[in-house]
A protein has these predicted regions:
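N-terminal hydrophobic/helix-forming segments and targeting peptides
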Residues: 10-469
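Single conserved hydrophobic/aromatic residue that forms the stacking wall/gate
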Residues: 1-12
Length: 469
């Protein structure tokens, strides 16, 4: 059994706890049903922050306003990452309490020149994003989400496949009757990356006249798809070149289990940590130390690029806030980062009785036992991990126990079985105390993942307690 401050199911034994657990789960389920891309998460995050009285840091700078304890600001990076600050009583130089999560999830990205017709069928070519089992993405309804940037400077939002009456798309699979060779392949090769092409149409464009020459018949189905896209979104085929379109599982997240104790949906990794991180910050009164929530992109492919955690965005925004507070210098910025505490809010693998052989039971995460702390992640001898200091873990234990938060500690499977990484090491490189902390997930990186509602609620409580450290 993993170590925990309360036993399995105790979350529900306290008075009125089930209602609180289920009410917050309903809020979260709506969030992940609406927000299936990093851009959509940022857009909804801005709405939540504005409603809570947060100002855009860009506007504060433009107006040459000063910031003080009690002020609340946010900043957006290229519409794909966001950071928010709840300025506390002590100087930022003395350190911040930071909640950091990622809002990108494994998916299929549409290529820049994707559309083609083959034997009367029109397909979109894709390039998968992040670590996926490719065979899981066939024969399942998919939706298209994203943006198309036009040459005139405008950006068109695209969502196809989410409304109950809307159409969906998908990737075909080979029928079992003809699959003898396919069934002999290793799982990694059963469906290959270049075979993940999405079927989007089969009806030719209706011709204005009765012309019958071959030129009119060529790519008639593709022409029909382009005509429909032009009619609804005003986009041409060449506009795919400057588009960011993502194929994701269609439809809303759902309650899971006969007792409704779980949620199944796309993108729990890592929006199940991102949402309570943001809500914990919004719920907080003025803290002693400045509270921060940063939600970033590109974690699933190494946290690279301008919107990933490895960019200078976070440091730059801390510098801007310190400047508005009248306390900026390069040395003070470095001190602020080194004196900070961070929870790298990312998911952990939930123990699964169907695959018990890959888990070491004493150090596994379990549904219903609260938020998960991973002192270290990595693989094959902790390679690539952030290993949190014992002293920092000791402080967090007291904070969680004082706030009556159910928590557990875990590793990602047995030694040498596998492993994984998060954004933790990137912030730790700035010399701050960082630990991975999040929620146990089954089916991680599958189109539909599963989490426990009790763990979600305890994690919200844990994040709220952390911000008051």
């Amino acid at each position: 059994d993993s170590s925990t401050s309360r036993g399995l199911g105790d979350v529900y034994k306290r008075q009125d706890m089930k209602k609180k657990v289920f009410d917050f789960a309903d809020e979260y389920r709506r969030f992940i049903s609406l927000c299936k891309t990093e851009r959509e998460c940022v857009e909804e995050g801005v709405r939540i922050l504005k409603a809570a009285g947060y100002k855009d840091l860009k506007d504060v700078i433009a107006a040459d306003e000063k910031l003080k304890a009690g002020d609340k600001v946010y900043a957006v990076n290229m519409n794909k990452a966001i950071v928010a600050f709840n300025i506390g009583e002590t100087s930022i130089e003395s350190g911040m309490n930071i909640l950091g999560a990622h809002i990108d999830s494994p998916r299929l990205d549409i290529k820049q020149n994707p559309l083609y017709e083959e034997t009367g069928l029109v397909l979109l070519d894709t390039h998968y994003y992040g670590g996926i089992k490719k065979y899981q993405w066939v024969a399942t309804p998919l939706a298209l989400h994203g943006v198309v940037a036009l040459k005139d400077g405008t950006t068109v939002k695209v969502v196809i496949g989410e409304d109950i009456d809307d159409t969906v798309v998908g990737i075909s699979d080979l029928l079992i009757h003809l699959a003898s060779e396919q069934m002999d392949k290793k799982a990694a090769k059963v469906v290959e990356g270049e075979a993940l092409d999405i079927l989007v149409g089969s009806m030719p464009l209706k011709q204005e006249s009765a012309k019958s020459d071959k030129e009119d018949c060529k790519d008639a189905v593709k022409k029909n798809i382009l005509a429909l896209l032009k009619e609804k979104y005003g986009i041409e085929e060449e506009d795919f070149m400057s588009a960011e379109l993502e194929a994701v599982p269609a439809g809303p997240a759902r309650d899971y289990g006969i007792d409704r104790s779980m949620i199944i949906g796309y993108g729990h990794d890592d929006r199940v940590c991102a949402y309570p991180s943001l809500i914990a910050l919004v719920n907080a009164d003025m803290p002693k130390r400045t509270g921060v929530c940063i939600l970033v992109d590109k974690e699933e492919i190494g946290s690279v690029g301008a919107t990933g955690m490895q960019s200078r965005f976070f440091e730059n925004m801390v510098a801007e806030v310190m400047d508005r507070c009248g306390e900026y210098s390069e040395l003070k910025l470095r001190r602020a980062l080194a004196n900070s505490y961070m929870l790298s809010s990312d998911v952990s693998a939930a123990y699964d009785p169907n695959y018990a052989s890959v888990f070491e039971k004493k150090n596994a995460a379990y549904f219903g036992k609260g938020m998960v702390f991973n002192k270290y992640t990595g693989a094959r001898g902790k390679s690539g991990s952030n290993d949190a200091s014992a002293e920092f873990v000791g402080k967090l234990r007291k904070v969680m126990d004082d706030a009556d938060v159910a928590f557990q500690t875990a590793e990602l499977g047995k030694v040498d079985i596998g492993g994984g990484g998060t954004i933790a090491y990137i912030l730790a490189n700035l010399d701050m105390n960082v630990i991975d902390s999040g929620i146990a997930v089954q089916n991680m990186h599958a189109p539909y993942e599963v989490i426990s509602k009790a763990d979600l609620y305890e994690t919200l409580k844990g994040y709220e307690a952390f911000l008051q450290m």
